Amino acid sequence: MAKISRKLQTQKRHKRLRRYLIGNKIRPRLAVFRSNNHIYAQVIDDDAQQTICSASTVDKELKEDSDKLSPNCSSSTIVGKLLAKRAIKKGIKQVIFDRGGNLYHGRVKALADAARDAGLNF
């Protein structure tokens, strides 16, 4: 029997998780996507099918700090703080965390902890 690739395992986990994680206007979903070089996070209202705010390592605000942004936990921390700041500015304090099928470890955990420290509740 062939071994299932790590990417396929992540996709299967994400499919299972999305059955239960549904964001609405009062408590939107904080979705995280992790690539090899970057990390992306969005606050999404699933009822209206609309992205409320987003942040990533390729953001314009973070371009001047591009030498510091490498694919590690410190850049995920910066993105988490930026996303929380933008969400609070739009009046969102509570979210549902969607780790996107990734394990809650490393860069995903660093982003979540930074968003919590900056004022988001989940």
From Swiss-Prot:
UniProt keyword terms in alphabetical order: Ribonucleoprotein, Ribosomal protein, RNA-binding, rRNA-binding
Subunit structure and binding partners: Part of the 50S ribosomal subunit; part of the 5S rRNA/L5/L18/L25 subcomplex. Contacts the 5S and 23S rRNAs.
Gene3D superfamilies xrefs: 3.30.420.100
SUPFAM superfamilies: Translational machinery components (SSF53137)
Organism: Prochlorococcus marinus (strain MIT 9515)
Alphabetized GO MF terms: 5S rRNA binding; structural constituent of ribosome
UniProt family annotation: Belongs to the universal ribosomal protein uL18 family.
GO cellular component, one term: cytosolic large ribosomal subunit
Biological role stated in the UniProt entry: This is one of the proteins that bind and probably mediate the attachment of the 5S RNA into the large ribosomal subunit, where it forms part of the central protuberance.
Cited InterPro entries: Ribosomal_uL18_bac-type (IPR004389), Ribosomal_uL18_bac/euk (IPR005484)
UniProt name for this protein: Large ribosomal subunit protein uL18
Biological process according to GO: translation
Recorded name of the encoding gene: rplR
HAMAP family attached to this UniProt entry: Ribosomal_uL18_B
